[in-house]
Amino acid sequence: MGGEAGADGPRGRVKSLGLVFEDESKGCYSSGETVAGHVLLEAAEPVALRGLRLEAQGRATSAWGPSAGARVCIGGGSPAASSEVEYLNLRLSLLEAPAGEGVTLLQPGKHEFPFRFQLPSEPLATSFTGKYGSIQYCVRAVLERPQVPDQSVRRELQVVSHVDVNTPPLLTPMLKTQEKMVGCWLFTSGPVSLSVKIERKGYCNGEAIPIYAEIENCSSRLVVPKAAIFQTQTYLASGKTKTVRHMVANVRGNHIGSGSTDTWNGKMLKIPPVTPSILDCCIIRVDYSLAVYIHIPGAKRLMLELPLVIGTIPYSGFGRRNSSVASQFSMDMCWLALALPEQPEAPPNYADVVSEEEFSRHVPPYPQPSDCDGEACYSMFACIQEFRFQPPPLYSEVDPHPGDAQETQPVSFIL
């Protein structure tokens, strides 16, 4: 629906003033796109106007303190911490009075004034409203009239800075592991360990995040694993920082008794409709994280937190491996261990590679030395000739003389 303002009172001669976008079904705009629409004006009788203009504005503001709504110190108190960044400032004239006359007369009836403008090609931060600041864009039509206050109508313009979750940094799997000793000093009851992995860093609204985790409870307490998505808002103003953090979604696991282990093989946590990550504004930032934590009675909770990016362009699945993360995740958490290489394959037999004919062609016969005579000398060189170009011994995994070897222990590598 378009914005509309009416004029009442003895001097009110404008019945309505409205602002309508050309594509009302378009939810949001991005940098470089065109915004089009028209201003609707209905006059009950002839109206004298100085002009009709259109304003498009966009800015990010962050402020807090005793005078957060003002830019000056009031009553000697502390000045407000405030900062502002301008993204859009545009003014268009839709109706002007003839030169030298100052006013124009608008006849009774309905009038329509089209407008069209392009958003800047530079990155525009996503629209957002938070506790200590906002990023807002608006379009306003202002009707200038002589001897009476200006009349205006305003429409919000939703802008989004697209984040593609198919970029390589956002397709990287995330994993962490941590252990906590329950108790203190000599009264420890054993450790609680937690390992967590997710398939990628980037997700979109409405997606469900499969969580892979293993919880091992070696303490004497009954523990409960939980997972949650947190939104963190960071505001910068006058060199100061404010942070707001709250939970947007959560899921709970089963109780884990002492000496027990629980595994999450893709436990789903759905992302609710939230503002996409805001990473390109210098005074307001919106980040997300996935926290998997364990509530331990009588002790601080054990928590692992993995960063998330909530994007706007969903995962395409292109180039996805056939095997899922679930197949790589087992009960013994094998993805945390360094896998040893497979046993090497035996090399081929030398005789299978080099034929006797080729051997004779490339190896000339040894001449008999002049200072050696007799059958013994010839036999010696014949032996050298026979074994000089022999292939190496065949590969064998079994020692043919095990009696001379000492027993060795197998070697394992643990991360």
From Swiss-Prot:
Its membrane topology = Peripheral membrane protein
Q: Name one Pfam family in it.
A: Arrestin_N
Location of motif PPxY motif 2 in this chain is 392-395
Q: Which GO terms describe its molecular function?
A: ubiquitin-like ligase-substrate adaptor activity
Keyword list, A-Z: Cell membrane, Cytoplasmic vesicle, Endosome, Membrane, Repeat
Q: Which superkingdom, per the lineage?
A: Eukaryota
**GO (cellular component) term, any one:** early endosome
Main location as per UniProt: other
Q: Which InterPro entries match?
A: Arrestin-like_C (IPR014752), Arrestin-like_N (IPR011021), Arrestin_C-like (IPR011022), Arrestin_domain-protein (IPR050357), Ig_E-set (IPR014756)
Q: Which GO terms describe its biological process?
A: extracellular vesicle biogenesis; positive regulation of interferon-beta production; protein K63-linked ubiquitination; protein transport; protein ubiquitination
Q: What induces it?
A: Up-regulated by high iron diet.
Q: Does the keyword Zinc apply?
A: no
* KW Membrane (keyword) present: yes
Its annotated compartments are: Early endosome; Cell membrane; Cytoplasmic vesicle
- Locus of motif PPxY motif 1: 347-350
Q: What does this protein do?
A: Functions as an adapter recruiting ubiquitin-protein ligases to their specific substrates. Plays a role in endocytosis of activated G protein-coupled receptors (GPCRs). Through an ubiquitination-dependent mechanism also plays a role in the incorporation of SLC11A2 into extracellular vesicles. May play a role in glucose uptake. Participates in innate immune response by promoting IFIH1/MDA5 activation through interaction with TRIM65.
- Subunit record text: Interacts with ADRB2. Interacts (via PPxY motifs) with ITCH, NEDD4L and WWP2. Interacts with AVPR2. Identified in a complex containing at least ARRDC4, AVPR2 and HGS. Interacts with SLC11A2; controls the incorporation of SLC11A2 into extracellular vesicles through an ubiquitination-dependent mechanism. Interacts with TRIM65.
Give the PANTHER family listed for this entry. Answer: ARRESTIN DOMAIN CONTAINING PROTEIN (PTHR11188), ARRESTIN DOMAIN-CONTAINING PROTEIN 4 (PTHR11188:SF16)
Provide the family line: Belongs to the arrestin family.
Protein's UniProt name: Arrestin domain-containing protein 4
Origin species? Mus musculus (Mouse)
